[in-house]
Amino acid sequence: MAGKAAAPGTAVLLVTANVGSLFDDPENLQKNWLREFYQVVHTHKPHFMALHCQEFGGKNYEASMSHVDKFVKELLSSDAMKEYNRARVYLDENYKSQEHFTALGSFYFLHESLKNIYQFDFKAKKYRKVAGKEIYSDTLESTPMLEKEKFPQDYFPECKWSRKGFIRTRWCIADCAFDLVNIHLFHDASNLVAWETSPSVYSGIRHKALGYVLDRIIDQRFEKVSYFVFGDFNFRLDSKSVVETLCTKATMQTVRAADTNEVVKLIFRESDNDRKVMLQLEKKLFDYFNQEVFRDNNGTALLEFDKELSVFKDRLYELDISFPPSYPYSEDARQGEQYMNTRCPAWCDRILMSPSAKELVLRSESEEKVVTYDHIGPNVCMGDHKPVFLAFRIMPGAGKPHAHVHKCCVVQ
């Protein structure tokens, strides 16, 4: 039986993981990753589990196809998952289509003890009972059980295509209907550009794209239900403020390219102490002399610079973060806690929810202290992103009967 014997309700586990690194070094990283993932499953024993992956297949999808198949097969048939007798897997494998390819992968697992679970058919506009294990890939656009979109081209910085978009599914469990949205937003292309303004130009691009997703999932086409949006939001700390704080007493040296006069490097040195270098900043270099600042007390002193979610405070809620920045970790299999010096560490990977979904989660917290929001594999190399998870329970009677949904209820 899933769930702790005494705890009522339906145990839910939501996980987001940017897995791009796993397919570059499958021998070492995949084993680590799966072991840590299974440990979280074992600890929380969910009845319903959703795993949202970004950059599925790595940087070169075509070259990674065999590793992808092996990873999916392992997840579906492993001993750790044997009690999950129903599954839905949606893999965007359409890598030849620039206009459509998002490299998103969404996995949903249902425990054998879970009864009365339905998935929404977006074309027929009705719920269907979930049975068996099914994998969908290649052309997800024609699959009625989900909505998939890549962002419009004019949303992309300089209109250059990259693998960014979202996949939405809708479920009804224990008389509660909710959307689960797998999302991947735009990254910071240059540390130097991010440093120029506060907020950065990149945060504005992410703001626009996330607003687009939220507008899509609450538009008039379908009934409104609670929603959880989890993925790689690429949220970054406000770079200008962070640098000012980390280098308060530093002097700045600017290095320019000889031919173009373009700024290519910033060097921040202590005013005294032999003018020791504190921080070096380049397009893809963020080399701060003391990484401990990002790990001390899980880096929570830096949360004041994590501001990108504030513009959505009426539409998206998040539990308090008590884990260190989830990116960019070293991809060296021997380094589990070291950050790469490519970017300022940030909480890119998040699990966010609508106000009504928040009520659903917090209701279980008040009755049974069973809500956990944390990262996976704190001491183990999991690739450049640490996965992040939310575990909670849907309490009996949490859903309210709703006339329009057959055998399903909506949290108001």
Curated annotation (Swiss-Prot):
Protein name per UniProt: Inositol polyphosphate-5-phosphatase A
PTM entry text: Isoprenylation at Cys-409 is required for localization at the membrane.
Phenotype for residue 409 to S: Loss of prenylation and membrane localization. No loss of enzyme activity
Propeptide part(s) removed at maturation, as residue ranges: 410-412
A biological process term (GO) from this entry: negative regulation of phospholipase C-activating G protein-coupled receptor signaling pathway
Quaternary structure and partners: Interacts with TASOR.
Keywords associated with the record: Cell membrane, Cell projection, Hydrolase, Lipoprotein, Membrane, Prenylation
Reaction(s) this enzyme catalyzes, per UniProt: 1D-myo-inositol 1,4,5-trisphosphate + H2O = 1D-myo-inositol 1,4-bisphosphate + phosphate; 1D-myo-inositol 1,3,4,5-tetrakisphosphate + H2O = 1D-myo-inositol 1,3,4-trisphosphate + phosphate
A Pfam short name: Exo_endo_phos2
Lipid linkage positions (S-farnesyl cysteine): 409
EC number of this enzyme: 3.1.3.56
